[in-house]
Amino acid sequence: MPLVEQKEETAADIQGLRLKFPGAADLLFRDLSVKILRGEKVLLLGPSGCGKSTLLQVLGGMIPRVTEVPMKAARLEVPESVGFVFQDPETQFCMPHVDEELAFVLENLAVPVQEMRPRIEAALRQVGLNLPDAHIPIGNLSQGMKQRLALASALLLEPETLLLDEPSALLDPEGRRTIWEAVRNVSDRRTIVIVEHRIEEVIDWVDRVIVFQADGSLVADGPAESIFRRHRNQLREYGIWYPEAWSDAYAPITESKSPALADPIEDQADCPNSSAPRLESELQPLLRLEQFSVLRGGKEACRVDSAIVLPGDLIAVTGPNGAGKSSLLLGLMGLLPRRGLCRYGEYLPEGRRAEREAAAKHMAFVFQNPEFQFVTNRVLDEVSFTLRSEAEHNLQQERRGGSARIGWPFVRRGRLTAEDEGKIERRALEFLHRFGLADYAERHPYLLSLGQKRRLSVASAVVSAKPLLLLDEPTFGQDARNTFAMLNLCEELRASGHAVLMITHETEIAQRLATRVWRVENGKLVDDRSTARSCTDGTRLVMGDADETFF
């Protein structure tokens, strides 16, 4: 009896896709063809901005049904039943409270009211979102908790196809394990397409890896083991994450300052301690906290009994989602009410206004969500805005007989001249080049990929040259190349006497690069420990040639 060949069913089939965003100079995809079989588990890999998220939106039917983008395709067959988890979870919430968000999904499925609560509670347990009361405002959740909620909403749909755009980017290690365990538990007979830079949790169970290069063209397509073995050099060349990327990139520097790290930012004014002695015991702290607490809604959100930040420090702030890490940084910047002692060098501000002014003078801050700090309609203007604001502040200080903010690189002549404006624009363009954003100078910040938005937000903060840089998850959504380049920039700042306070869930950063690790749990700094690195140690992370600059 002859064997009957079983026909493989197609979940999605895209042939000859050509797509171009308004205002972009080039096509994103040029005749891209991808077929995904029903039940396949597919991982999309590629540099930041190569079109992975855009392809997911095409597969989900949002482009062109919801978002009008000029595109053509010889064939466009996409799944009918889709659950989508966006890169930014806040973009998909429709209701103000957690239980209402999940109930809204069930209402659309015509689920009887009496069945909703047990299904909502089960969905929250499935993704590890343990709340004392599900009727809590979504705005009160941390970004990592919002990611769990977004996945719970998608799973409640019980879709045939799950499209996951970095669903674990903002989660702590335990949260990542919980999320991917939940996905695996519902993966049987489902098609799953994943965009994820943190590949360690998924490479063992995906059937297939598709690799793109920066222009959106397909580089490789095959089983994970084969891709990472046969195409390792290409992945390294394109700056894409692969299992050994950290080991290949790590290059300690034994001297306190190397030529690669010296004088990282031209024209900066001297930062306090920039020529400080090498011994940590002789360094003057940039920041000292004593009995310091941050308040949210009148309640204590984070408490620090005692801590200091030294010039040359890179402090990794770690802890589970919702522990109070972001609240701590917001309080330091004066964006949340605070109590206790917060001394900047020798200066101790008194009063709320003095505290905010001192924070603005000594620190720059990068939000977890980069869109929170965009204030202009053009990428170039975002960086120029920071420079111009610093200049205008200094002019006002001069008129009042006060001192200028630290780090201002331009001359001050009582007013901004055309020459100053030219310097500002040239300086801004220099930073865009370094951050890989020069080609997008005229684009609206909201039209960038999430990884590009993150780099723009960091560029806008770093250009101010403040002594202390506060970063809330700066590496999420970044490929390997840009992650290492951003960390190299932090190393350069350290070598110039600056310090970096970085919230991160990346254990490699805490283990390899941090001079200190702060552990925050249940709203309190519970551990402040030194690492093997001192404030005067140097490190450079490389991919490809050691002398290559990636920004």
Named regions from a protein language model:
Residues 45-47, 318-320:
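The feature captures the beta-strand-to-loop junction immediately N-terminal to the Walker
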Residues 196-197, 504-505:
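H-loop/switch region of ABC-family ATPase nucleotide-binding domains
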